[in-house]
């Protein structure tokens, strides 16, 4: 079985990488006045500029050839058609069906997926309108004021990120709170600020057995019953997103108040489903629907745009180029928009849980680096935290810079100041500052030659740091949908090019299984499993000191 590194296009790129490592972005721009127009493209609502990446025309041609040699178009068709491309779990991958605004029928395993999705969306809409209008009443006859979403991972990060993105645009109909951590501090801090009579809990767990989620759900219901006193009241204050009707019924949730999901939707791709219920409750169903519409627009672009202008594919190819060929093992996500402050954490899960694997489709260890470490924060805060390392560190970190043209809230000159930093940082990372420029600057400031000699080496910025810039028209619901879908399809393309199964997460399952065993040991001295000396020592220390 051959792996990707044996492809002709891969080997051509290896040679080009050796050559490109000797080139400087400053020189590439100087040689080509049309570089921006050649290496940028647009879709409605978004400009995508990758001209500050370390590529040239030859490299770009070779990257497109790699995509073709990996049959990216055929794999894309398989995904949209519902073929079971999640090969380790024998499942379709159909988060795109959740936002199929054309409502075209799609049959998978004898069921019309489109009809299932449309029915569930209608149920969500009805429920959301009932709660937001005040017609849904709690056990004491009062309407809902607060929503507490309890989930973890994909059941939490996506909805919370989208909610934060729309906070400045939403009304005050409902407050929403998110609980994901098994650390009791988080749920306790939420419960002390809400009223049991006016709170709705959304428990999101496909199996309704996820340890962290059910631990928090039990704490929530115990707290609720201290006030409500009657188990029958649970049905008016708890709803679920799950497929396990037996477990939800045991919990006290009416079947009518259980929203479903399907095994062809992975958690980290699920905010388009009923997992996004908290988004709709907070921002309104119309906003939730606009998120779906924005994502659908990108789905259509991804399906139909030529490979050379296909933004998700280009994003994936650049990531593979930077990671597997140029050797950059980290990537920063830097939104210059406070509304997108949770995007780095969301994409960290999306990319690293999807493509953080070391074997190919055939189970063979791959000889190249796969996914980079994804991290970041809002741009201005990052400038005063870690940009020093981006500019002068000896580890090069490619970065995605994201900003909006129109702010959600326009305050005096704030946005111009923000965007001036956005533009300046990518230019500085690309150009750097050389000895001649520094010497001229210090001389103009009246520094002596001795002072210049002392400072010179410390002030050199090599530049040549690759970045991509995305300019959004604005950050609204449709934009949020577009942006997330772009990265989702990037993840898919990256997985195909690297020959990685992007839709399982066996590393997550391993940790969950071990934690379950150790939990049993911590609560019952009679239970013993074999561990290494470090784990035994840590557990013994914990048990010795937890009651002191």
UniProtKB/Swiss-Prot annotation:
One of its GO terms (cellular component) is cytosol. Pfam families: PGI. It comes from the Bacteria. It comes from Pseudoalteromonas translucida (strain TAC 125). It is an enzyme of class 5 (isomerase). It catalyses: alpha-D-glucose 6-phosphate = beta-D-fructose 6-phosphate. The gene is pgi. One of its GO terms (biological process) is glycolytic process. Belongs to the GPI family. Pathway: Carbohydrate biosynthesis; gluconeogenesis; Carbohydrate degradation; glycolysis; D-glyceraldehyde 3-phosphate and glycerone phosphate from D-glucose: step 2/4. Its main location: cytoplasm. It is found in: Cytoplasm. GO terms for molecular function: carbohydrate derivative binding; glucose-6-phosphate isomerase activity; monosaccharide binding. SUPFAM superfamilies: SIS domain. Its EC number is 5.3.1.9. Keywords: Cytoplasm, Gluconeogenesis, Glycolysis, Isomerase. The active site is at residues 353, 384, 512. Catalyzes the reversible isomerization of glucose-6-phosphate to fructose-6-phosphate. This is Glucose-6-phosphate isomerase.
């Amino acid at each position: 079985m051959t792996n990707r590194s044996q492809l002709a296009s891969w080997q051509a790129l290896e040679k080009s990488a050796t050559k490109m490592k000797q080139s400087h972005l400053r020189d590439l721009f100087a040689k080509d006045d049309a570089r921006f127009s050649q290496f940028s493209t647009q879709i409605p609502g978004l400009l995508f500029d990758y001209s500050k990446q370390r590529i040239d025309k030859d490299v770009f041609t070779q990257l497109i050839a790699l995509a073709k040699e990996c049959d990216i178009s055929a794999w894309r068709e398989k995904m949209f058609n519902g073929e079971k491309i999640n090969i380790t779990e024998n499942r379709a991958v159909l988060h795109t069906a959740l936002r199929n605004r054309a409502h075209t029928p799609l049959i998978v395993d004898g069921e019309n997926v489109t009809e299932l999705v449309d029915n569930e969306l209608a149920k969500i809409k009805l429920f959301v309108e009932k709660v937001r209008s005040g017609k849904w009443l709690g056990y004491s006859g009062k309407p809902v004021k607060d929503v507490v979403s309890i989930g973890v991972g994909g059941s939490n990060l996506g909805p919370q990120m989208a909610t934060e993105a729309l906070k400045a645009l939403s009304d005050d109909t409902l407050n929403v709170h998110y609980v994901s951590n098994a650390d009791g501090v988080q749920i306790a801090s939420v419960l002390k600020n809400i009223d049991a009579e006016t709170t709705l809990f959304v428990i999101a767990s496909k199996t309704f057995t996820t340890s962290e989620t059910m631990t928090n759900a039990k704490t929530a219901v115990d707290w609720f019953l201290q006030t409500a006193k009657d188990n029958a009241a649970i049905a008016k204050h708890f709803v679920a997103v799950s497929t396990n009707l037996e477990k939800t019924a045991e919990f006290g949730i009416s079947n009518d108040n259980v929203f479903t999901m399907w095994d062809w939707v992975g958690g980290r791709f699920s905010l388009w489903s009923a997992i996004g219920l908290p988004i709709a409750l907070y921002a309104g169903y119309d906003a939730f629907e606009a998120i779906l519409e924005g994502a659908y627009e990108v789905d259509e672009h991804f399906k139909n745009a030529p490979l050379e202008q296909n933004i998700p594919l280009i994003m994936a190819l650049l990531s593979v180029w930077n990671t597997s060929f140029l050797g950059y093992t980290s990537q920063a996500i830097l939104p210059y928009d406070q509304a997108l402050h949770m995007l780095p954490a969301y994409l960290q899960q999306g990319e690293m849980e999807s493509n953080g694997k070391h074997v190919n489709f055939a189970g063979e260890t791959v000889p190249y680096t796969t996914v980079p470490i994804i991290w970041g924060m809002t741009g201005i805060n990052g400038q005063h935290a870690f940009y020093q390392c981006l500019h002068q560190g000896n580890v090069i970190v490619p970065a995605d810079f994201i900003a909006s043209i129109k702010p959600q809230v326009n305050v005096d000159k704030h946005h111009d100041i923000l965007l001036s930093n956005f533009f300046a940082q990518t230019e500085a990372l690309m150009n750097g500052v050389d000895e001649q420029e520094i010497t001229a600057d210090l001389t103009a400031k009246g520094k002596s030659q001795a002072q210049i000699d002392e400072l010179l080496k410390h002030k050199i910025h090599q530049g040549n740091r690759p970045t991509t810039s995305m300019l959004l028209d604005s950050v609204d619901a449709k934009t949020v949908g577009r942006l997330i879908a772009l990265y989702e399809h990037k993840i898919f393309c990256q997985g195909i090019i690297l020959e990685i199964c992007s839709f399982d997460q066996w590393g997550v399952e391993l940790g969950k299984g071990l934690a379950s065993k150790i939990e049993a040991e911590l609560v019952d001295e009679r239970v013993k499993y074999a561990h290494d000396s470090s784990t035994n020592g840590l557990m013994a220390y914990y048990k010795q000191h937890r009651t002191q």
